Swiss-Prot record:
PROSITE patterns for this protein: DNA_POLYMERASE_B (PS00116)
Source organism (scientific name): Enterobacteria phage PRD1 (Bacteriophage PRD1)
Record's protein name: DNA-directed DNA polymerase
Gene Ontology MF terms: DNA binding; DNA-directed DNA polymerase activity; exonuclease activity; nucleotide binding
Name of the coding gene: I
Transmembrane segments: none
Phylogenetic lineage: Viruses, Varidnaviria, Bamfordvirae, Preplasmiviricota, Tectiliviricetes
EC nos: 2.7.7.7, 3.1.11.-
GO biological process: DNA replication; viral DNA genome replication
Function: Replicates the viral genomic DNA. This polymerase possesses two enzymatic activities: DNA synthesis (polymerase) and an exonucleolytic activity that degrades single-stranded DNA in the 3'- to 5'-direction for proofreading purpose.
Length: 553
């Protein structure tokens, strides 16, 4: 009997959000309200039983929906776990998709990894108004804020889906778009193992630390990775041959010799560009830049990796760079964001290692699920549910050699510019902080050119991803990865007597200054005890609160 074809389910798009107690260290926030918007109806609920009421109401809807929550896979969905059953998709501890009855829940952050505030349509609010003892008197304002978030998210997601389809992640979306211009095939596991030693990430390095007063400039490359994809050639197959000399077909080199800050080696704490001698694995792009700048002095070439099939990704980059430029000129902020994400999200997908992929399932507690008890399986038990994970049976290897070449090309651009920098203080992937930068193309819009992003007269550098640049009394640029030193809630900093956009701008500057003061303290030899008010929810229901002592590195 011929197999019947499955009827495709037509899903309606919806946006959803919980409002909870404000974040406070060691206090697990509880939802007190939810909002739901599908483009036609908006529904909200207020009360301590809002979780149960949401599921009860959702089960009355007969039309299947895909329901998006921004960062839902790390927050909102965790309040609903006991209602989920069946297969779910999890990547790096984030729930990407899970089902409840006829509906699917998806984390919109997976396709739009930007804060909602990037849309410039998000309403700001003082989260202190959401404390239990005060929220009733601010109910109307809170519900307006909640509705605004739902409507904005629905708009963003709907526009994204209209352009790219109902994709699960931005990386998958970007690769799907790239394949329309540059078709590629998966590669073999053995090829991945052979090429992976040549893959490294971006360069981040503090050349000086402390509090530095000088004429300071911040330069960055316009779209570094799209530039590397378009304007450098890259291997584009899994067919290669080894030799011991460099030719026009060489893309990777294993060599022994002297390295003067040109190329990295891996350490337990990350990439190190300061190993002066030894054996190195280097892309041809960095090799050429190192030879030209005198920062690579080889004693011998151990082997070269050579490819006959190569490409640039010019058609893909030109298409979306042009679309992004048109969106900018039209004042279309949403599509400007979309195209920027597409341009910057494909190269990393080539480097993904699928060996740690897992298939996940969620069941009620107290049962045994066959097939999830072998090697590499994982079981996370909770009172109300059990999460079961096992190694994925079907997966593809993308071409890590492509990613190794693209990231190597990006580092080569940075290396050449560092050689032209006057008093380089700091660099990170596509940017250099220095006194001046000469003999490089300067243009605010040209792909691959350098742009003067900021200027200042004082900088506090405490380590990698930890600096604050000042112009006078104002912090104009700040980095504090791993510890949110800049207040996320800027509502309480907004002057009440100002027009909202102007008040928001003032609050953002105040928030930067607050973060900058903390980095000044650390860069001056002190320490800062960071207490994260935001909880870290685990899939098994556990909640962690992070404390860190931040000091110079």
């Amino acid at each position: 009997m011929p197999r019947r074809s499955r009827k495709k389910v037509e899903y309606k798009i919806a946006a959803f959000d919980f409002e909870t107690d404000p974040f406070k260290h060691d206090r697990i926030p509880k939802p007190f309200s939810w909002g739901f918007y599908n483009g036609e109806i908006y529904k909200d609920y207020w009360g301590d039983d809002c979780i149960e009421q949401f599921i009860y109401w959702l089960d009355t809807i007969e039309e299947p929906h895909v329901i998006y929550a921004h960062n839902g896979g790390k927050f909102d969905f965790l309040f609903l776990m006991k209602y989920f059953r069946g297969k779910l998709k999890i990547v790096n501890g984030r729930i990407l998709e899970v089902e409840h009855g006829i509906h699917k829940f998806r984390d919109s952050y997976a396709i739009l990894p930007v804060p909602l505030a990037a849309s410039d349509e998000k309403i700001e609010i003082d989260y202190g108004k959401m404390e239990r003892e005060t929220r009733e008197q601010h109910k109307a304002e809170i519900l307006e804020y909640l509705k605004g978030d739902c409507v904005t998210l629905h708009k963003m997601v709907s526009l994204f889906i209209a352009e790219f389809g109902m994709r699960l992640t931005i990386g998958g979306t970007a690769m799907n778009e790239l394949k329309q211009f540059h078709p590629y095939d998966p590669v073999r596991k053995g090829f991945d193992e052979a090429m992976r030693p040549f893959y490294f990430g971006g360069r981040c390095q503090a050349f000086e630390k402390g509090i530095i007063e000088d004429d300071i400039k911040v330069y960055d490359v316009n779209s570094m990775y799209p530039h590397a994809m378009r304007n450098f050639r890259h291997p584009f197959s899994d067919e290669f041959y080894e030799a011991n000399e460099i030719t026009e077909e060489t893309y990777f080199i294993e060599w022994e010799g002297e390295n003067n800050g040109a190329v990295p080696v891996r350490t337990k704490t990350g990439l190190d560009f300061n190993q002066r001698s030894g054996i190195f694995h280097t892309s041809i792009h960095e090799w050429r830049a190192g030879i030209d700048t005198g920062t690579i002095k080889p004693n011998r070439i151990i082997r070269t990796i050579n490819f006959t099939e190569t490409t640039t990704f010019g058609a893909f980059i030109d298409h979306f760079f042009s679309k992004r430029d048109a969106a900018k000129k039209a004042g279309d902020l949403f599509h400007n964001i979309f195209y920027k994400l597409i341009l910057n999200s494909s190269y990393g997908k080539f480097a993904q290692n699928p060996e740690n992929y897992k298939e996940w399932c969620i069941t009620e507690g107290g049962i045994y699920l066959e097939g999830y008890d072998g090697e590499g399986c994982e079981v996370q038990e909770h009172l109300d549910y059990i999460l079961w994970g096992r190694p994925a049976e079907m997966f593809n290897y993308f071409n890590v050699a492509v990613a190794a070449s693209i990231t190597g090309a990006a580092r080569s651009v940075l290396l050449r510019a560092l050689a032209q920098a006057e008093r380089p203080l700091y660099c990170d992937t596509d940017s250099i902080i220095c006194r001046d930068l000469k003999n490089v193309p300067l243009d605010a819009y040209q792909l691959g050119a350098w742009d003067l992003e900021a200027t200042g007269d004082k900088i506090a550098i405490a380590g990698k991803k930890l600096y604050a640049l000042y112009a006078g009394d104002n912090c104009v640029k700040i980095a504090s990865k791993g510890a949110s030193l800049v207040p996320r809630d800027i509502g309480f900093l907004m002057p009440p007597d100002m027009e909202p956009k102007a008040a928001k701008k003032v609050a953002q500057q105040k928030a930067k200054n607050i973060g900058g003061e903390k980095i000044l303290k650390v860069a001056n030899g002190g320490v800062y005890d960071f207490v994260n008010d935001a909880p870290s929810f685990k899939l098994n229901g556990n909640v962690q609160f992070i404390k860190r002592t931040i000091k110079g590195t």
